Amino acid sequence: MNEVNVFYNLEGIDDTLIVTLQDITLENRTFDRKGDVARVYDRESNVTAGFNIFNASSYVEVTDNGNVTLTKEFVEKINGILAKNGFEEKVEADFTPKFVVGYVAEKEKHPNADKLNICTVEIGTETLQIVCGAPNVDAGQKVVVAKIGAVMPSGMLIKPAELRGVPSSGMICSARELELPDAPEEKGILVLEDSFEVGQEFKF
């Protein structure tokens, strides 16, 4: 299942709902428009990268600005809009929390970068390998993990990455990156109290 993200900014991109499914190379990107919907896809593989829904407010009420909180009902409405405009393809979404409490089980130095560490982080349902550059990260900590598909307050989408040759699946967050009030200026991840439960959603 693709990581679905939906964006809406009435002032920035007019009355358009942006539905992203996956990245494709810019050179191969092309469009197929039917009615108020444009399908964005790869001209070589025919893989769908997303949909742009124009005149969105005539179909659905959107109260979010920026990244839209997805619910089952909202995704059903998106699929209804696609069908109404002649597209048979359906969007499927993962509704599990994207920001969760993690436990740093192990930390080892990155073999190719002095300031990076390779962390083994348990998040309840799975164990992730995350490359982290924070100076204060250490084994035994409870931290906030942004999973693949999470959208940071800055608008940055968390994607699978490779840092200096080492795969990284997610990000260990600082208070500043989460835009928490009174976040410290100095660099460093947010270390949580031990009372937080591993795997639980982190709300902010």
PLM region descriptions:
Residues 1-204:
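Phosphate-backbone binding interfaces of nucleic-acid-interacting proteins
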